[in-house]
A protein has these predicted regions:
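Alpha-helical membrane-protein architecture signal
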Residues: 4-8, 25, 51, 130-133, ...
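Multi-pass membrane catalytic core of lipid/isoprenoid biosynthesis enzymes
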Residues: 21, 50-57, 73-128, 205-258
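Intramembrane alpha-helical segments
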Residues: 8-14, 62, 84-175, 179, ...
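Membrane-embedded alpha-helical segments that form the functional core of polytopic membrane enzymes
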Residues: 26-71, 81, 105-113, 122-137, ...
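The first (N-terminal) embedded transmembrane alpha-helix
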Residues: 16-35, 153, 157, 293-298
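Extended hydrophobic alpha-helices typical of membrane-associated regions
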Residues: 4, 9, 230, 236-308
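Helix-loop junctions at the membrane-solvent interface of multi-pass transporters
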Residues: 33, 114-118, 140-141, 165-166, ...
């Protein structure tokens, strides 16, 4: 039992559960937005739905991260930056990781299935195998295409769509959640390009595909800037197509909290790119992007609650 908890602790530290902050806030924002979107608005979100969404996100992210770690263990062992991870360092065995991956897949399907009897919504169960397939795709994509950054972005971009499907399936018939998913896809794809700058030589040596390995540092930074500009455009469209997010709520102004969030996100992305130019990857990747996710979710949820 002690060994089991020790291995679980090692894996939790290795996949950095705190980095769930990149996707979970957008799932929660979508969950609050979804009841008011579509042709048949729902009365609101139930606490049980929120709990199931959080559990689904936990299982999905853990499944995705461990699948990536398992399939990449030989590449990680050859990279000084990642050689200390649990699998290449030998602190856990592949069979331990496979066991947890299977548990997470079962956990995700079970939580998705619970929406059926509890909320008469069987769409999450039907979608769960497709979600698992997409989440596993990133781990192998980098072997074949430099667009793997956007496959990762798409995996995180599933979070608002899946949450909307779970709370109010009719919400996916309207643009806001699709635009939000597009923002997440481009935002994550852009900052993953920046993060991959650290591994240019390793990726080229191992035959792994990435935009930095293909284009080099300068063109990759320009690509990331362009991608993030497109992401900001989609974020503005999210606001314009969602009444809750465009209605003024800040006293004495014509701004919603979400519109203020968009302005602040633009500033944070500018800081992120300046940090990347100075090779300050920890600041650019973790701190600033965590702030972006929390800021947008908090601002959006505040606007939704103020509309009630």
């Amino acid at each position: 039992m002690i060994s089991l908890f020790r291995k679980g602790s090692v894996l939790a530290g290795d996949i950095k559960l705190a980095h769930s902050i990149f996707a979970l806030p957008f799932a929660l924002l979508a969950a609050f937005l979804a009841p008011g979107i579509g042709t048949a608005p729902a009365p609101g979100i139930a606490p049980g739905q929120l709990l199931l969404i959080v559990l689904c996100m936990f299982f999905a992210r853990t499944y995705a991260m461990l699948t990536n770690r398992l399939l990449d263990r030989s590449f990680d062992a050859a990279n000084p930056r990642t050689a200390g991870r649990a699998l290449p360092a030998g602190r856990v065995k592949p069979r331990d990781v496979i066991f947890v991956i299977l548990l997470c897949a079962i956990g995700l399907i079970a939580c998705a299935a619970a929406f059926g009897p509890l909320y008469q919504n069987y769409y999450p169960l039907l979608a769960s195998p497709l979600v698992l397939l997409w989440l596993g795709a990133y781990a192998v994509a980098k072997r074949f295409t430099p667009l793997a950054h956007f496959i990762l972005g798409g995996a995180l971009g599933l979070s608002p769509l899946a949450a909307g499907l779970a709370v109010q399936p009719a919400s996916l018939a309207s643009p806001p959640l699709w635009l939000l998913a597009g923002f997440v896809l481009l935002w994550v794809g852009g900052f993953d390009i920046i993060y991959a700058l650290q591994d240019i030589e390793h990726d080229q040596r191992e035959g792994l595909h990435s935009i930095p390995a293909r284009l080099g540092r300068g063109k990759s930074l320009l690509t990331a800037k362009f991608v993030h500009l497109l992401a900001l455009l989609l974020l503005v469209l999210v606001m314009r197509t969602s009444p809750a997010l465009r209605t003024p709520h800040i006293p004495g102004t014509d701004m919603s909290w979400f519109s203020l969030g968009v302005v602040l996100v633009a500033a944070l992305l500018l800081i992120e790119h300046r940090a990347a130019q100075r090779n300050r990857f920890t600041l650019a990747f973790f701190t600033l992007n965590g702030l972006i996710a929390l800021l947008l979710a908090a601002a959006g949820v505040a606007d939704v609650l103020l509309m009630m």
